Amino acid sequence: MPEQGPRMNSFSLGELCWLFCCPPCPSRIAAKLAFLPPEPTYSVHTDPSGATSLHLTERADWQYSQRELDAVEVLVTRTSRGNRVGCMFVRCAPASRYTLLFSHGNAVDLGQMCSFYIGLGSRINCNVFSYDYSGYGVSTGKPSEKNLYADIEAAWQVLRNKYGVTPENIILYGQSIGTVPTVDLASRYECAAVILHSPLMSGLRVAFPDTRKTYCFDAFPSIDKVSKVASPVLVIHGTEDEVIDFSHGLAIYERCPRAVEPLWVEGAGHNDIELYAQYLERLKQFITFELATS
């Protein structure tokens, strides 16, 4: 998978003083900690009939054939905050029961993730629906915490209303910063399951590991929302994560009412969990067997 961005917690002394002496609003913290939109690696073309197609740049590092590229569905929808958000539907396993609603990391866009989605979906027998955050890829607006929540809500509505996928067949999958909108949506809607890959407790807790409570100016307070998630939750985290400390995954796991056996990947960092064999093994076990009996 493409790298998800540099350390989130490299702050200068001046920035530390700024945070504590002049506490900013959550949107300022969010922008400072999380959002690193790359130059777009794809575009969405619309022909005279209204049909859309995906066009990738070389930086997307496409790993499959033109036939498989042509099968990827793309569209643009509008959020409640007025932004246009790019969406992608990768039908890896047409006969599969489940579709992942995938929220990606902070330094990639759909073009860079597309090959990964095909590989993941085909291996765990799931279709993959994903979207770009405001300010990423073809999505308009600027990335912000409020836009994150509106973006995933818009994607959820497209998956539900355009494609007719019912909540009991949707698995919410969030990675890194993508766990933030995933937890928010899962705290409001029940679904088949939730997968939190390298989750964070909150923005301040990433920047300042000794933070023990959620302040009014904190951003991304997933630790306060995850207790409201009614669906089964699988937490995945590397024990040597250099961006979001392993303690975040452990704390999130302990707060989940319906947490299943987590996957703690010994020795894994923030961007290499997918390279370990137990990653796919745990996903297959969870989706194929555990959800069937939950």
Curated annotation (Swiss-Prot):
It catalyses: S-hexadecanoyl-L-cysteinyl-[protein] + H2O = L-cysteinyl-[protein] + hexadecanoate + H(+). The keyword Cell membrane applies. Palmitoylated on cysteine residues located in a cysteine cluster at the N-terminus which promotes membrane localization. The keyword Membrane applies. It is an enzyme of class 3 (hydrolase). It is a lipid-anchor. GO terms for biological process: regulation of postsynapse organization. It is found in: Recycling endosome membrane; Cell projection, Dendritic spine; Postsynaptic density membrane. GO terms for cellular component: dendritic spine; endosome membrane; plasma membrane; postsynaptic density membrane; recycling endosome membrane. The active site is at S176, D241, H270. Keywords: Cell membrane, Cell projection, Endosome, Hydrolase, Lipoprotein, Membrane, Palmitate, Postsynaptic cell membrane, Synapse. It comes from the Eukaryota. One of its GO terms (molecular function) is palmitoyl-(protein) hydrolase activity. Its EC number is 3.1.2.22. Belongs to the AB hydrolase superfamily. ABHD17 family. Hydrolyzes fatty acids from S-acylated cysteine residues in proteins. Has depalmitoylating activity towards nras. This is Alpha/beta hydrolase domain-containing protein 17C. It comes from Danio rerio (Zebrafish).
